[in-house]
Amino acid sequence: MGIQFQEGKQFDVIALGRACIDLNAAEYNRPMEETRSFTKYVGGSPANIAIGSAKLGLKVGFVGKIPDDQHGRFISSYMREAGVDTSQLVIDREGHKAGLTFTEILSPEECSILMYREKAADLYLSPDEIDAGYVRSAKVLLISGTALAQSPSREAALKAVSLAKAAGTKVVFELDYRPYTWSSREETSVYYTLLAGMAHIVIGTREEYDIMEGASASGNEQTAKMLFAKEPELVVIKHGVDGSYAYLPSGETFRAGVYKTNVLKTFGAGDSYASAFLYGLLRGYDIDQALRFGSASASIVVSKHSSSEAMPTLSEIKALVEEQHV
């Protein structure tokens, strides 16, 4: 049995958080110091998830803040053309810029990112820029962990969560840990713990949960038990090549393996996983089926150059799931 969502809402998913610029190395197998050409894409975990969800046919909205410049216009235009409602994409008028992420692809196993997040526009989304009616109009409100990293974005995210819960909207917390934005792991732990306890569904890697717990070696069952003492109804813990696990308060556990693919790079997998997993839940899939859907989507994205543009179609995911049984 899957998660139950309130019907009669305008949107399936509204994502809140960062929409920024990814500059992915166009030259493979060389360090960033020697890389001279990059390809520009829209990036940022919640933006990627929104784009991926829209590509799968969900009705998707986005809440965020972008700069009043060429990068901001590129982000807004791309997301709109991808099928995401951008009516709540606020334009920053105070000179803040888009976050920039450069990627390095040394090999399929060795990829890295370099982020520039100082005074990024998305972190200046304020509580008074949250439209209550808009937030209430979704079956799911997805919050990215990076939105909690600084004020006023932190307070805006928490306001949106309160509004959503009061309206029967399910809150999904995608941990999305990016050390460049936080002042310390201790600060991250405080705010992750706060929002994870308020969310209905929590999704993250084992390493991200360890940061939240301030632990170096916690077990999945311990993590799930801790969260089920609060409000979560479903906890998803990803273990990279070892697959992903989902836990219910009833004690039921589900697992999906990893689909074989020709890996080009490692980034983007989590965002594609989340969009396809949520698609499955919203379409009434059983949890184990939704896990496989997320895993298949992640495998497709890591075989391609971008994150946002590589988000797969429904037919691509279904074909891979039918081809391989994991």
Curated annotation (Swiss-Prot):
Protein encoded by which gene: iolC
CDD domains referenced in this protein's UniProt entry, alphabetically: KdgK
Function text: Catalyzes the phosphorylation of 5-dehydro-2-deoxy-D-gluconate (2-deoxy-5-keto-D-gluconate or DKG) to 6-phospho-5-dehydro-2-deoxy-D-gluconate (DKGP).
Annotated EC: 2.7.1.92
NCBIfam families: myo_inos_iolC_N (TIGR04382)
Pathway where it operates: Polyol metabolism; myo-inositol degradation into acetyl-CoA; acetyl-CoA from myo-inositol: step 5/7
Native source organism of the sequence: Shouchella clausii (strain KSM-K16)
Residues annotated as transmembrane: none
UniProt xrefs under PROSITE patterns: PFKB_KINASES_2 (PS00584)
Protein name: 5-dehydro-2-deoxygluconokinase
Catalyzed chemical reaction(s): 5-dehydro-2-deoxy-D-gluconate + ATP = 6-phospho-5-dehydro-2-deoxy-D-gluconate + ADP + H(+)
Enzyme kind, highest EC tier: transferase
Family: Belongs to the carbohydrate kinase PfkB family.
GO MF term set: 5-dehydro-2-deoxygluconokinase activity; ATP binding
InterPro entries recorded: Carboh/pur_kinase_PfkB_CS, DKG_kinase_firmi, Myo_inos_IolC, Myo_inos_IolC-like_sf, PfkB_Carbo_kinase, PfkB_dom, Ribokinase-like
Family annotation (HAMAP family): IolC (MF_01668)
GO biological process: inositol catabolic process
Keywords per UniProt: ATP-binding, Kinase, Nucleotide-binding, Transferase
Highest taxon, organism lineage: Bacteria
Phylogenetic placement of the source organism: Bacteria, Bacillati, Bacillota, Bacilli, Bacillales
